[in-house]
Design a protein with these regions (language model features):
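Amphipathic alpha-helical "lid/sensor" segments that cap RecA-like P-loop NTPase cores
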Residues: 163-201
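Conserved small helical "lid"/interfacial subdomain of P-loop NTPases
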Residues: 138-164
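Conserved P-loop NTPase "ATPase switch" module shared by AAA+ and STAND
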Residues: 71, 87-109
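Sensor-1/coupling segment of RecA-like P-loop NTPase cores
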Residues: 104-143
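P-loop NTPase Walker A phosphate-binding motif
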Residues: 50-65
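Walker A/P-loop nucleotide-binding motif
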Residues: 35-54
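AAA+/P-loop NTPase substrate/partner-engagement loops
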Residues: 62-91
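A short, basic N-terminal segment
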Residues: 1-36, 186-201
């Protein structure tokens, strides 16, 4: 199978949307307002924190606000000086600073960034643990959610054929949906999805 035809290719995974109803979005935005637009999206690895942050930024943009995104990689204890300068330059009340992976920052870097972001109208971060800011949303995963995502990617019939494997994948990757979907990409790339058990299953 060509990589671009794989139903679990990166571009198809990125096209998935966070599972939140219109009413859920209204409640989330109302809570963000109650928290003074300074809050954290919390959850384990692969639970959709980045996706929710990106979609929240897009929603805020439709409300006339300007989302300013900073993404921190694993082990990045402080943002690159040029990235930090670009993020914080000219911040005003209409800007909302979004920091993906804020818990990667060391205490001094986090304190400095938080102070600098006071000029902005908001600060929303993602973190694996609570405590950086009041919690806006806690992301979680389940086998049912994994099955729902797989159904969207491959269709109901094929997803049903995969269903017996999904619990094993979910457990193997400790609930990390991103890792589970990556494993399905490898499986589809190697052979038809319905052929034989998962390696190690």
């Amino acid at each position: 199978m060509r990589a671009r035809d794989n139903p679990f290719a990166v571009h198809r995974i990125h096209a998935l949307r966070f599972r939140l109803t219109d009413e859920g979005w209204r409640e989330l935005l109302a809570r963000l307002s109650t928290l003074g637009c300074r809050a954290a999206i919390v959850g384990p690895e692969g639970s959709g924190k980045t996706l929710l942050l990106e979609e929240l930024g897009a929603r805020l943009g439709t409300l006339g606000l300007a989302p300013c995104l900073l993404t921190l990689r694993r082990g990045e204890r402080r943002p690159a000086p040029e990235a930090r300068a670009a993020l914080l330059a000219g911040l005003g009340p209409a800007d909302v600073v979004l920091v993906d992976g804020a818990d990667e920052l060391g205490p001094l870097a986090w304190s400095s960034l938080r102070r600098a972001a006071r000029k902005a109208g908001g600060l929303v971060v993602t973190s694996h643990r609570p405590g950086l800011l009041p919690t806006l949303w806690t992301c979680g995963t389940s086998v049912e959610l994994l099955a729902d995502l797989v159904r969207e990617l491959v269709g109901s019939e094929e997803a049903e054929a995969l269903r017996p494997r999904l619990a094993a994948l979910f457990d193997r990757h400790r609930g990390d949906l991103r890792a589970a979907l990556r494993a399905l990409y490898d499986l589809y790339g190697a052979s038809p999805a319905t052929a034989g058990p998962l390696p190690g299953a």
